[in-house]
Amino acid sequence: MNDVRVPTVHDLRVTLLDVSPPVWRRLRVPSTVTLSALHGILQVAFGWRDCHLHEWRTGERTLGPPEEESWGDELEDESAAVLGEVAGADCVLHYDYDFGDGWEHIVEVLAVTPYDASQPPLAVLDGARAVPPEDSGGPIGYEHLLDALADEDDPEHDDMLEWVGDAFDPEEFDRAEVNRRLESLWRWH
């Protein structure tokens, strides 16, 4: 693939707030992506299913999809906002996903560096833990879910286990699988 259009990359650390132990990802992302594309990248990196509304906040700006209604602020079109123009080194963005559950992410720009053609321009470099299941009730609901799953005597244990499935492991994070999905996403970018 020819990545001449990628002059620099952003080194990001993205942390899901109010969840303990922390769920986080460290990514290398082309500085040329829009916030709309970064939304898709974060959905893949965290394992969200893109079933809910989202928005970005930085300074006085609130950005999101043009057809989306914000919660009080006028939204700028995220598809016109390029990461490299919105967020430089040491900048912090706020990424909110699923306003009902209230999943808040902090996106820290750790560095902006020249693109090294020997590395993929888009990759998850590290991370920890599985993302909470969609519609699990936000941080408080997720904590309740984890407590019920951990205690076989909890009256909701069986219902919660049936809901999330036997394969759900809150400690699991498969970096190689996420990178396969990101590579596929980047090919179609």
Regions found by a protein language model. Give the residues of each.
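Short linear regulatory motifs enriched in tryptophan with gly/pro/ser
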Residues: M1-H189
